Amino acid sequence: NLNRLANKIFIRPGIPYNKSVFDKSYEALSELKNFKKISFEFSQIDSDSNKDILVSDIFLTSGNKIAYSVELEATTNPELKEGISGSASLSHYNILNGAEHLQLTFKGSNNFRNIKENGAVINFTIPSLISPIQLNQILNKTSKQKTIFTASVIEMQRPEFTRNSISGSFSYQWITRQKFQHKLSLFNLSYVNFEGNTADLNNISEYLIAKDYSSHFIPTSSYTLSYENKNKLKNSSFFRFHIESSGSLLRSLASPLNFNQLKNEEGEPILQEDGAPTYTINVWNSENIFTQYIKTSLDYRYYWKINQKNSIAVRTMTGLIYAFGNTNQSPFHKKFIAGGANDLRGWQAFKKPAGSLQNNIDTLFTGGIKHITSIEYRFNLIKKLKGSAFIDAGNIWEISSNNDEYEEANFKWDQFIDEIAVDIGFGLRYDFKYFILRTDLGFVVRDPSESDKWKWRELNFNNSQFNIGLGYPF
């Protein structure tokens, strides 16, 4: 596809020589992953009248179009905690002779606490924006334009439940001149089927079961904006904004198109708290509730380089998910958690209670609001071995709970500061060149769920939380 190839070359007749234009062209051609060698050669026209004109010849050497990879690694998925995961991928980088990338991935994970996840993912990427309107012309100052189709089938098995999900999405991705990366997901359709193990679900609070564990259809659209000015020699920063909406279009069509309503065993409609009906949609001959919510998050990170061996990393993140209309509660896997290897490292993932709610070791905690701030001092030890000292502060909350027993989980402005949880700790990082193996030991110093919140006198290794992960936490 010569037109698609030409769109990756930003050199134009008559423009002044500019090295950045050639660098941008080289980067765009490399992004296609179709060439093992790319080179530019320049020559000057041998003419007195055109002595200031350069001719650029571009040489492209075709590379392998098919690649495969097999990976085995330690997983830090917050739902799986620590465990072993593996994947096998097969890729074709020119499947339709237009630098289209097709990737098929099979993956599986096995947690040390009897939690398994297996699935398959298909990604089909076109290196341009495919649309009825000429988006390429509107965004002619952008690079790395992509249209992405994704489909997946995932099964998660926990002692408490089995969750099967099937999803498909259609997205655009592009980067502007200012290095802002945009991702617009026009639609992402997911069907989640939940089957509970009654014996184990008895160990989980009724509040959590009623809120989160149900089969449902999730239609979403989302937009993500991110920016990173990564620089190993200077201070750098990272910014990410995400907003996601689910179900509003279906809800607006439910009444005009006479969607079915959720009913009880007596055939009476089950109404929302405001008296509105709950509509369902037929998925594979089964009536399922479709979700309706809005979710947004903001993540900012700053990396202060003190010198070659010492640096300070700061992260602050705030998120909100609010269910309305057709559903009172947000899907379990869309909500926020606290604890684990990447934020409040003094707690296990899912084990940090929302707000000042009392801890229950048999409950998996989630929240509709999250705020976390972490500061980490990073320093070199010996060769590839590095160390860190950190402090994490934050929590998760529910937006509202009608159950008085869980009132302490609700977010209240006048209790926000008092319900901030704090941990401190230290860790080691070993650089294996291709990845970084990380271990952290976290100690809870402030627990808002306890009457005596400060835990300085209880700091010891018996009360610590060990975390292992790949890469830096942020």
Residue ranges and their predicted role:
Residues 67-69, 78-124, 128-135, 146:
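Outer-membrane beta-barrel translocator/receptor signature
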Residues 430-435, 460-474:
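Outer-membrane beta-barrel "beta-signal"
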Residues 20, 33, 49-51, 79-83, ...:
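Transmembrane beta-barrel outer-membrane domains
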Residues 54, 311-390, 394-404:
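Extracytoplasmic gating/loop element in the C-terminal half of outer-membrane beta-barrel translocons
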Residues 1-74, 107-112, 139, 294-298, ...:
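Periplasmic polypeptide-binding modules associated with outer-membrane biogenesis and secretion
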Residues 12, 43-45, 61, 73-77, ...:
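Outer-membrane beta-barrel pore domains and translocons
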Residues 67, 115-127, 131-317:
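Transmembrane beta-strand segments of outer-membrane beta-barrel domains in Gram-negative
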Residues 155-156, 206-212, 281-287, 359-363, ...:
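Extracellular loop and loop/strand-boundary signature of outer-membrane beta-barrel proteins
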